[in-house]
Amino acid sequence: MTMSLKRILTSALASAVLVTSALTFSGCADTSVAGTIEGVTIPAGIYILNEYDALSQAISDFKDKNPDVDTNAEGFDFFAQTIDGKSFSDYVKELTAQNCKNYIAIEKMFDSMGLAIDEAEKSEILADVNATWSNENTYAQDFYGVDTYGEYYEKNGVGKNSYKEFMLNGKKSELIFNSIYGEGGSKEVAQAEIEKWFTENYTVMRYISVSKKDKDGKLIEDEAKLSELKDLAEGYAEKINGGTKFSEVYNEYLKHIEEDEVEIKEENELDILLSVESTSPSEEFVKHVYGMEFEKAEVYDADTYYYVVVRYDILKGDYLDEYKQVALSELKGDEMTATVEAETANYSVSFNQATVDQFSPESIG
């Protein structure tokens, strides 16, 4: 899935990317033109936002294709690498061009399908944009020397209107996607398929971690003391299996270790959504949890903790409704991308080379 279409999951993705990245190029007015696609003008701001998506995608693609390369090593430079026989920079440029074409395709598809963003959603997006431009931000002040992120974007080629249109385009992507694959859509994904994806990829757990370390943070080596800790953990598991609420046992442990944490009152406050691909705290731990019976507490003996763990059926909570969009995107995101990119196959494209050069991948990376 290209980065521009990953905004199906959250139209604020590009905002998050830009907030955590440092733009280094000199600014240009929001009215600067990056080019035209199907006769539609692409402002520099829209081009830059799509380029940031492309840069993120290129980094992800490189890591996927080169899992043994330490990209965090001192002196590592993505722009000295190649992807699929292309320079990293050229790869980003190609993705950027496609992202811009996808942007236009989304606009055209949205109109042709007769869709509309409801006023509440539009107001929420506009409020977020206005807040970005008007709310003072200490991070922006400390790191970028400006009062607001809006001022920061303006200095670096992304005007308020471009930012707004980019966010609205993300919402349009989401609405198109849901009109095809969501409830009542032309290619509605069956509930059984969604549930199957959830149960294969996620589970819910709660745990209490009984530390094997002393107050100084050193691992306890005394077997008698370790045995006491294990007995404590097993006692908690027995209480849970005997019908005591998990939250009550958890609070009991907090008192035992004289922890001043806020007392847990709701059971689901302790829920953890665990991905099958997770490696925290270890791959062995995750594999063990996925093999557990539902609602039966067990003690897992790890290097530094005795974990009192309970696994729960993810389909019994509210998670299915809460994360349904994630499941749909994982199941049908690539198909959606193919559909959109097919729309762009014969698009006429003309980029302003001066603008493209000014906002090169190297300049924003």
Locate the predicted segments by residue.
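C-terminal motif of bacterial Sec signal peptides marking the signal peptidase cleavage site
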Residues: 20-27
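Cross-family detector of peptidyl-prolyl cis-trans isomerase
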Residues: 30, 38-44, 247-249, 254, ...
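Second-shell loop/turn segments in exported
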Residues: 33, 37, 82-97, 106-116, ...
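Bacterial N-terminal signal peptides that target proteins for export
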Residues: 2-13
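Peptidyl-prolyl cis-trans isomerase
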Residues: 232-283
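PPIase-associated folding chaperone regions across multiple families
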Residues: 148-228, 278-365
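Sec/Tat-exported extracytoplasmic proteins
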Residues: 51, 58, 100, 104, ...
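N-terminal targeting/tethering segments
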Residues: 29-155
